[in-house]
């Protein structure tokens, strides 16, 4: 349903990969797989990161090599230009996935479940009674898609 489609801003360091800035850390388990599924479901993904210049290009290329493509990078839409926006730099996203979230970053299985079921973090945790480390949700989803 198109009414359920969201614009999702995703941080890079500490969210998609472990914090090793300015280097690129190891992928956080299931990050790229989850992002690819969200893109296949037609959500608009925006890479929202402090990286700039060459460091930003390295992050974009790292994602591309793993099949993750973003609708835009550090802006609301691809054609947006800093010099012509005349308004706040704040993104107009429906959801932000960032390791600096209040309460920290849930695992990517929980993130997918929260988006898919449109539930906030607390009810998901209460339903599952496992706050972190349970990746069975995403593993089941990947298994279904690979059959």
Give residue ranges: language-model regions.
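Short, small-residue-biased leader/transition segments that mark boundaries at the very start
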Residues: 1-2
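Alpha-helical substrate-recognition element adjacent to the catalytic core
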Residues: 6-82
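C-terminal cap/substrate-recognition subdomain and adjoining C-terminal extension
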Residues: 44, 56-147
């Amino acid at each position: 349903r198109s009414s359920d489609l969201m614009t999702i801003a995703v941080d890079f360091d500490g969210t998609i990969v472990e914090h090793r800035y300015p280097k690129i850390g190891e992928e956080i388990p299931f990050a790229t797989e989850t992002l690819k599924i969200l893109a296949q479901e037609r959500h608009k993904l925006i890479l929202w990161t402090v990286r700039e210049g060459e460091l930003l290009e390295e992050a974009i290329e790292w994602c591309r090599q793993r099949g993750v493509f973003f609708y835009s990078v550090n802006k609301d839409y691809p054609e947006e230009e800093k010099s012509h926006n005349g308004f706040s730099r704040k993104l107009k996203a429906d959801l932000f996935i960032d390791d600096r979230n209040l309460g920290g970053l849930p695992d990517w299985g929980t993130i997918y479940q929260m988006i898919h079921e449109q539930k906030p973090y607390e009810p998901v945790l209460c339903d599952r009674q496992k706050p972190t480390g349970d990746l069975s949700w995403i593993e089941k989803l990947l298994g279904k898609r690979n059959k």
